[in-house]
Amino acid sequence: MKSRTRVVVIGGGIAGCSTLYHLTQEGWSDVVLIERNELTSGTTWHSAAQVTNFGMNQTMVGLKTHSINLYKKLSDDPDYPINYHHGDGGIRLANTEEQMQGYRHFASMARGMDVHFEIIDAEEC
């Protein structure tokens, strides 16, 4: 086992694996990932793995859009097949006017980021 390395990533969940992946894509080779059990066997394994573009600021929308595109790219690699399906759609409910204002803000921001987001009222459901 190595006793020295440039980067140690602790945890083999989605965050740790993603960090290691992106470091290697940037050309880093002296990196090690440490996981106490099997990769993705903790919280990541229990996740429903729902990835949406929804986020209340441009940074989060951009990060989520990048993730969706990355998972699609990874699923197309015949050497490392993963089972990935990205469906279109979702439902979020507003119980207060404050929540509704948040959704209106997101809808306005989403239009500028090429993310489809539609607000419907109770009668349209």
What residues fall within each predicted segment?
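Short, flexible hinge/linker loops that cap or flank conserved catalytic cores
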Residues: 1-2, 25, 85
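N-terminal Rossmann-like FAD-binding beta1-loop-alpha1 element of flavoenzymes
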Residues: 5-33
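Short N-terminal amphipathic alpha-helix/helix-capping patch enriched in small hydrophobics
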Residues: 16-19, 47, 67
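Glycine-rich, phosphate-binding/catalytic loops in enzymes
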Residues: 26-27, 48-50
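Short glycine/proline-centered loop/turn elements that form peptide/ligand docking sites
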Residues: 40
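Conserved catalytic-core motifs of eukaryotic protein kinase domains, centered on the activation segment
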Residues: 43-45
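Dinucleotide-binding Rossmann-like beta1-alpha1 core, especially the glycine-rich loop
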Residues: 49-124
